[in-house]
A protein has these predicted regions:
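Conserved substrate/cofactor phosphate-moiety recognition/catalytic segment
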Residues: 32-96, 108
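Conserved GTP-binding G-domain of TRAFAC-class P-loop NTPases and closely related GTPase folds
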Residues: 134-196
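Conserved phosphate-donor/acceptor-positioning beta-strand/loop module used by diverse small-molecule
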Residues: 118-140
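Phosphate-binding P-loop
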Residues: 11-15, 91-92
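Proteolytic processing junctions in secreted/extracellular precursors
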Residues: 3-11
């Protein structure tokens, strides 16, 4: 992980993009805070999504949603994705270095984004944060309560599905990003993050 940190601190003209990959609750935000990359723009669709849910007066406790709230959530996510896509597009046009804070659960979409970024002159990295399913589910379960209702929690089925996709993508992402791939493990067994 130190290699990634040093590369990002280099003062070069080529913009850099870091694509984060990890299941919900893996600790991607925790890892970012530890790297202290506060000078690099962070793009996260969840920020827009949470704002949209609040504006629609929908509880962020998504794991206990009513059918009516799930419908509102879908509308909020659709709008968040549109706004987020524009944010990413504008950032790329401006040649700004940035961190894409998400799960990267879709291998196909990640490959497309990586290609688009490289065509735009970016050096592209992936920071993959692994956690076991138990931690992912526990973090999701506790997220809403621990935040005092200010952060969202997902339905367990969504966490499980995303965890499976992200975990299956580890080797393909390692092969795709080669030397620009860094992975760490964040598990319940101890509080220390380990390089994979």
């Amino acid at each position: 992980m130190i290699k990634l940190y040093n590369l990002l601190l280099e003062q070069v003209s080529q913009p850099k993009a870091i694509i984060l990959s990890g299941a919900p609750g893996a600790g991607k935000g925790y890892v970012l805070k530890g790297l202290d990359l506060s000078n690099i723009k962070v793009l996260n669709v969840d920020n827009r999504y949470v704002d949209n849910l609040k504006q629609a007066n929908v509880s962020l406790d998504l794991k206990n949603s009513s059918p009516e709230d799930r419908s509102k959530q879908a509308i909020a996510m659709s709008q968040a994705n549109k706004d987020f896509d524009k944010d990413v597009e504008d950032t790329i046009k401006a040649k700004e270095s940035f961190i894409l804070d998400g799960t990267a659960a879709s291998y196909k979409k990640t490959v497309e984004l990586k290609n688009e970024l490289e065509e735009a002159g970016y050096e592209v990295f992936m920071l993959y944060v692994y956690t076991d399913l138990e931690r992912s589910l526990k973090q999701n379960q506790d997220r809403f309560e621990k935040s005092g209702g200010k952060d969202r929690s997902l339905m367990p089925a969504i966490v499980l599905s995303t965890w499976n996709k992200v975990t299956q993508n580890h080797k393909p992402y390692k092969d795709l990003f080669k030397d620009n791939f860094v992975s760490v493990a964040n598990t319940l067994k101890d509080e220390k993050i380990n390089d994979l």
